[in-house]
Amino acid sequence: MSTTRKLTLDFAISAESYIYDLYFSEEFSKALYLEGLGFSRCEQISFDRTAANHIQRTLRLCPAMNAPKPVQKVLGDTQQYDEIGSFTPATNTWSYNVIPSTMASKIQTVGQMAVEASGPNRCTIHFEVTFDVKLFGVGKVIERFMASQFDDNLSKQKRFTEDWIAQRS
C-alpha cells in the first residue's frame, strides 16, 4: 500500500522564469533547502542541460527530521537521500525518484512537478508524490510521516519562494 499527495502552488512569476531562473538555479536550490526548509545538507551532485533544455539533476539532501519514535527507531535521527530527476521541456514536467541512504530497497518515493502558465507573470505548479514503504508493522506510519513532512515542506517552500520572488522583483 502507498500514500500519494497531490498539491498545487501558485506564484507571481512566469512559468519559464520559475523553471529556469529559480527551480534549476543552484543558488536558489541551496537557499531553499538550507534556509527555507532547514535541511542540514544540499549538494548538487550532477546537472546536465541540453541545448533543447532537457535537464537531468541529482541533489544530495539531508532534511531535518522531527519523526515520531517508531519512525526514528527504523530510520534513525537523520536521513540522507538523493533526488534524481529529469525535466521534460515539452510538458514542463520534472519527474524524480528519491533514493534514501538507508533501506533503499524498502522505501520508495517517486514524484512529479508540472509547471503551467496561469496568466501574465503567473504560474501554477502541480505536485504529485507517492510514498511506498515496505516495512511490516511500521510501513504505513512511515508513509504518513513522509507525507506530512512533504506537506509541511511545501508550505515552507511557498513562503520562501514568495519572499525570494518579492526581494528580486
Locations of the language-model features?
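Short alpha-helix boundary/capping motifs
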Residues: S46-D48, M113, S155
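Hydrophobic pocket/interface hotspot
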Residues: Y18-Y20, F127, T161
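A conserved amphipathic terminal alpha-helix motif
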Residues: Y23, I84, K140-S169
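Short solvent-exposed loop/turn micro-motifs enriched in small/polar/acidic residues
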Residues: S2, F39-S40, T78-Q80, K106-Q108
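Glycine-rich portal/gate segments that line the openings of hydrophobic small-molecule binding cavities
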Residues: E43-V98
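Solvent-exposed residues in well-ordered beta-strands and their adjoining turns
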Residues: D10-S14, R60-A64, T88, E116, ...
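Hydrophobic ligand-binding cavity/cleft-lining segments
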Residues: M1-A67
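Beta-strand/loop substructures that line and gate deep hydrophobic ligand-binding cavities in soluble
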Residues: Y81-S86, S95-A147
